[in-house]
Amino acid sequence: MNNERYYLLTGAAGFLGTNICMQLLEKGCKVRALVLPNDKSVKYIPENVEVVLGDLTDAPSLEPFFTVPEGCTSVVIHCASMVTVNPNYSEKLMAVNVGGTRNIITKVLNHPECEKMVYVSSTGAIPEQPHGTKIKEVSKFDPCDPKLVVGAYSQSKAKATQMVLDAVSVMGLKACVVHPSGILGPNDHAIGETTGTLLQIIKGEMPMGMQGSFNLCDVRDLAAGTIAAVDKGRVGECYILANKTVTLKDMCDMLHAECNAKKIKFYLPLDLADKIAAGLEKQAEKTGKMPLMTTFSVYNLARNNEFDYSKAETELGYTTRSYEETIHDEVQWMIAEGLIDGNGVTEKPALMTNEQIREGGYMEDIVKAMEHVPALPEIDPEKAYKAIEQNVVETYEKIEDGVVGSYKKVENGFVSAYKKIEDKFVQKFLARKGETTEDVKKRLGRK
């Protein structure tokens, strides 16, 4: 009797999905992938993965994906979602991320041979905590505070996560949730945002960076953690799959050490970057072009990106490798793919070259965006010198006053002590003669 287990994977053509496929195949597992019709990314799915066409938003189209041979069981890893850096509400986003998850839940409940569901959420779905506090798993996601769960994507993932947990408690769904942070590493065939940024840095096409921090995980570690959740994840529980934070400067230094990438010399303060981004967004509304930088991207650097992933380490056996190892492997993958030649020269464009910025008129957008940034005050050298001089004089006077004051206090103390000693001495002398100070004053005719 055939008793194979099928791993049903949505989002199999994505960065995380392809790595999950590869690891499952290495374990000898039977893998089936759900792919949108006419999705060009299907070419990135490894061989030996069964591909089934379907649409998350079309429930009937999912039936072939869930139907497995008689006697077989299945588990679902729901990895697919629509990702966007646009923070504004989108019906399509909600239809895919929330409505699509609802359809997956319904199918799992209608197929008794489906033993488990692992929902791939996001750390962005967890309410942000103040800086200095590590963010931990929560059990309630909806309603979400838009000030703590920022952006339409994160809010859609929060709603979908709550839907999964509600189905567990109300309908008996056997499911758990993983919350990956940002993704980094090799095998990013579609050249996503993070890989594109690294290519820009390697090519020297990023003239300046931004301050702030990321939380990025090696895609292979995220894939392993997600697969582990199938058998080790407790039903109704959530697990953060994250890493230590890293700055853009740290990343640039690692790339410089790995492949002699050009170092970025200037990093925009986040408050200034936010103002420039706001200006670029206003300009983009007029031109219809995507802004080079958004206030949402600045927020993601400025927010608290410290996550506590100890629960996943303890229960799932989740581990993270060093950023240095990930950077090394990703650079080697880029060389193997012909993206770079080993000397930091790329054959494919990263996100956008300087020439493309100029030709597309983006430079004009940046200049116009700067009009929305409050002007910095002009500096008069003579006034600046006088201000410094005045500050020095005032500081000296304070020190001088302090010294003089201390001297006077000491002097007064000596005088007071001397008078006390003198008075005691006189009293003792007169006592020997049987007189008092009053007797002496009368004898001398003094008052």
Language-model features: locations:
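N-terminal Rossmann NAD(P)H-binding glycine-rich loop of SDR-like oxidoreductase domains
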Residues: 5-27
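NAD(P)H-binding glycine-rich loop region in Rossmannoid oxidoreductase-like domains
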Residues: 39-40, 49-99, 103, 107
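Conserved Rossmann-fold NAD(P)-dependent oxidoreductase catalytic core, especially the SDR/UDP-sugar
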Residues: 91, 99-151
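Flexible, glycine-rich beta-alpha linker
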Residues: 126-127, 173-195
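A conserved pocket-lining segment of Rossmann-fold NAD(P)-dependent short-chain dehydrogenase/reductase
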Residues: 143-148, 197-217, 221
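Active-site Tyr-X1-5-Lys
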Residues: 148-176
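Substrate-positioning beta->alpha
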Residues: 193, 210-230, 237
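Mid/C-terminal beta-alpha module of Rossmann-like enzyme folds, strongest
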Residues: 225-293, 309, 314, 324-360
